[in-house]
Amino acid sequence: NTTQASMASNIGLCAIADAAKEMGYHNAISNASDIYSANSFQPPMTIGTVQASPLTMANVYATMGANGVECTPIAITKVTDRSGSKVKVPSANCHQAIDPDIAQTVSYALNQGVVQPGGEASTTQLDNNRKTFAKTGTNENTVMTTAGFVPNQVAAFVAVADAQDPINNTFDNKTINGVYRPSWYGMYIATPAWKQFMNTYLAAINAPIDND
């Protein structure tokens, strides 16, 4: 965390927030949707204090996987009326959010966290030695996360201790599935769930392995 704080002091919060917003990052709280709000625009934002939704995180990771091209998540890909005529669907508004070289540099760092000995994301490595770009995360023992991507596929998983009152009902000193831990981290629940989904889905669609 200290390295992130040092980086933020050199780059400046405005530049960081601008880049994050371009990549689709925003606060999920209904009354504080702007990343520049007092709730979000603070030095700790660099270590993940903005309350982003799983969909937002998946979109940000997708932007990095697409060489910096950000597209608004659209659930509908095609609509036809009863006569078979196509109905216009919302645009994904795809645009170059960040420089491709920057996106590739971040992606390289994500992959190194997977492949390097002792890497914090080493448990995210997918089957068949498929090149994996992922990151685990934990926030005050209230949320466990894992997000990541391979070419043309991205996913984000979040486990919340108590959606109604996460501050007072944390993962601290909990027994889950017969396992007790004083503290729970992203690698314990979020990573296995993310990894199982990715492996199952990639196998089901016969996704080619692209490790370039």
Stretches found by the model and what they are:
Residues A20-A38, L126, A159, D165-D172:
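Active-site-adjacent bridging/hinge elements
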Residues N1-N27, A38-A66, Q112:
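Active-site-adjacent helix/loop patches that line small-molecule binding or acyl-intermediate pockets
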Residues G12, G24-Y25, D34-I35, T175-N177, ...:
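Glycine-centered secondary-structure boundary/capping sites
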Residues A5, Q51-D212:
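A penicillin-recognizing enzyme superfamily signal
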Residues H26-T46, W184-F197:
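Repeat-unit-sized solenoid/scaffold elements
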